[in-house]
Amino acid sequence: MQKGQRPSTQLRFLIIVILVIGIFFRFFNLSRKVYWPDETFTSLRIAGYTKTEVVEKLYNGQVIGVEYLQNYQRLNSEKGIWDTIKGLALEEPQHTPFYYLIARGWAQLFGDSVATIRSLSAWISLLAFPCIYWLCIELFNSPVTGWVAIALLSISPFHVLYAQEARPSSLWTVAILLSSAALLRAMRQSKNIAGWGIYTATVIVSLYSFLFSGLVMIGHGIYVFAIERFRINKTVIAYLIASCTGILTLAPWGYAVTANLAQATTTTNWSGTKVSLFILLTMWAGNLSRLFFDSGLGSNDSLIKLLPLITVILPILLLFGYAIGFVIRQTPKSVWLFILALGSVTFLALVLPDLILGGRRSGVARYPIPCYLAIQLAVSHLIATHITHHRRQKLWRIVFIALLTGGILSCTISSQAQVWWNKGPERTKYNPQIAQIVNRAAKPLIISDAKLDIVQSLGYLLDPKVQLQLVIEPNIPKIADNFSDIFLYRPSRTLRSGIEQAQGYKTEPAYQGSEIWLYRLSK
């Protein structure tokens, strides 16, 4: 493929069609999937509340309605932007505030329904298309690669899923692509101060989108120093100034992280939960394959369900390996080194602690996004090169069509689902069925001592007639007898046994899967 070669009319038409399909899936059925606990925290932050004050108001044993429960997920005149920032700083300092401030402004303009809040991520995700095209032009000087990259990104099941989630992942994806393209542009026009100013601005946006952007910055730094042969010249100095400016700009939030480090550690300690190497490998393979194909299965599913997918996952992983090797062999150092630097720093920062200390950080699908983008760049260039090479056009066109078809099928299936692997199925998998059972009752009451985010997630599926009685373990509520049906939702052993022993109720499963989340009370 010649540098600067333009795509054919047929290829351009195909990719435009794929792009339209990808955009459609980003906005289709936005409110279909469960609003999972992590997303309820997004709404909590947008509303300006802290978890502590909401628990204090709700978990007191008083009977409340669903509307009252959900009031703390909605905007109100009592809370402002400062409350959003304060809530993040105190309870989730590992999350930088840029996305949440944008989301609050979005909610003020368009409303705070599930579809509206999620649509912000969908709109932001559209910015990734021009950004990845620009990056391909700067990196490969190849419009064909840029068009192929747009097609693969637009219909990628992984990126479509996170474009429909009320979390910062889409914003971070755009920030990574934008800062990477801006860096290459600034290096190419090293004497242009404006170029480095733009890169500085993208670094600030990246850092305030997600703290792991620091790893992307390190990758950029390795690339700059290596390309400049570790000499301190104008390009290196300009990069250092841009990076230091970004870090200094982040200093106020760095203080918040330091001041509330214990809270950040407590909130994220789940990622340090030890898992076997086999589970870790399964998570890596599953996450990587979801760039092009997604069956909906997660790492917690049984091996019997996962085994048949090897016939799909293995070829995709082999394609990734071949693409990386192809780029290293066939492109200049300035190209392949950038791809390796972009992906490897984040990869090593996540994988090494897991292998040495134990944990599952590297298996969290949204953390290695820089790695995914590096792989997608390599695959895009591999396909773009071969579909314009006459000897191998037919084979690689088949590969290209297969990847696009896999993405379309995956997005079609996932768009109809209420629970998917990215919606915390270990916390939400039975909620749709549970909500149906409760909503069928004439005058139902739900009693629970489950965590706030768990209860609020279920609340989005409940009818307004449903009443709730929430307590903090080991408290046992006094149950009124003016309800047609009384349910226990995900009760602790203390709550269940306390109600049985102290108030003479019998508990029996109202819905039973592999775990029992809902009990019905009777006397």
Set out the residue ranges of the language-model regions.
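Perimembrane helix-loop-helix junctions
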Residues: 182-199, 203, 215-247
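Catalytic lumenal/periplasmic loop and adjoining terminal transmembrane helix
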Residues: 392-517
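Transmembrane-helix signature of polytopic, membrane-embedded enzymes
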Residues: 132-155
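Transmembrane-helix motifs of polytopic, lipid-linked glycan transferases
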Residues: 119-140, 178, 321-325
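Interfacial juxtamembrane loops and adjacent helix segments
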Residues: 47-95, 99, 107-110
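Specific aromatic-rich, kink-prone transmembrane helix
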Residues: 131, 151-155, 161, 171-190, ...
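Hydrophobic/aromatic-rich transmembrane helices and adjacent perimembrane loops
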Residues: 337, 359-388
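Signature aromatic-anchored transmembrane alpha helix within multi-pass, membrane-resident enzymes
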Residues: 1, 16-17, 328-332, 383-413
